[in-house]
Structures are given as structure tokens and as C-alpha cells.
Amino acid sequence: MPYLIPILYVIVSYTFFLLPGLFDQVVELQIISALLPFLMGVVNLIVVLTVGRKWSKKTLLNCTLIIKYGLIPFYLIGGCITISVTLAALFPLPLMVLFGLVTVVFLIFGYGILLGAAPYAIAYLIKSCKEGRHSKAVVILSGICQFLFSFDVFSMMILTIKEKHLVKTTIAVFAGVCLAILFILLYVLSIFV
């Protein structure tokens, strides 16, 4: 049961790109569907502040990993789109400047989704510090990383390995991310060569 909200958050985060297109005629539904990930972020915060206080450190870590690992493809694809659109906006053609606005919108939505994922990680960090598992310096540094793209995932990977929890899964996810980045770079290089 504690994993239902994190799984739902990941699903909502992926569908927020798709849902506004389903409601072509009703603007209110488009707005609500675009804001759904932010509303789910508030739900995450409420769940962590109420029920989540009673959960174990492992449960909070698992909830964090569901969200962080589940959103890796979202941020890889979104990052590629953002970089492509930003580079396209640099070309001196009419209306290409408007592409810069797309970059700003993607960054705002991406950061909003990042913020919505943070409550579980912060709760885990606080609980692990209280139990003496991690030092205050590590907890503060990891807490700051929860608000920075990519660093949030890598800091949780390091802490997960340090906890000796889901080590094989974490290594497999890290290898998958490295392979995905390598394929993206090779694809970009093949375009220019």
C-alpha cells in the first residue's frame, strides 16, 4: 500500500505530456491534466507528513527509488528534447526564438516534477540521520542534491549502495543510464558526421 502513491506519481508524470492532447476542445481539462503532476507532488508531501512518519526507513527508501528510477527515462527524453529545442532556437530563422519558450516551459515542468518527488527522499534522509545510519553532512549534501537534476538520482544511488539495499538493481539502473547516454551521444555524433 505505501508504494501506490509513488507508482501513481510516476505514471502521472509520464502522462502529463499526453493528456492535454486528449482534451482538444475543453481548455479547463487541458489545464488540469497539465497541472496533475504538481497536484500529485502536493499529495506526496501530505502522505509523507502524515502516514509516512510511521513508515520504516526501508519503505521510504523504496518509495524514493520507485520515483527516482521510474523517472529516469522521462528526464533523459525530456533533456534531449530541451537541448534540441534550445539549439534550434539559436538558428537565426524567423520564429525560431519561440523555441526558447518551449525550453523554459520544459524546465519549469521538469523541475516541478523533481520537487514533487523530493518528500520521500527527504523523509528517508531525516530518518536515516536520526537512526545514525548517515552523518549530518551526508544528509545535508544529499538533501541539497534532491533539488538538482541528475544529482538527485546519483545521490540516492550512492546511499542505496551504502545501505546495501537493492545493490544489484542500482548497479543495473546505473549501467542502463550510462548505456542510454552513450547511445544518445553516438546518435548525435552520427548526425554530424
Question: Which residue ranges define each predicted feature?
Answer:
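Membrane-helix boundary/juxtamembrane motif in polytopic membrane proteins
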Residues: 63-67, 126-148, 167-170
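Juxtamembrane boundary at the C-terminal end of a transmembrane helix
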Residues: 184-193
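Membrane-interface alpha-helices
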Residues: 133, 156-180
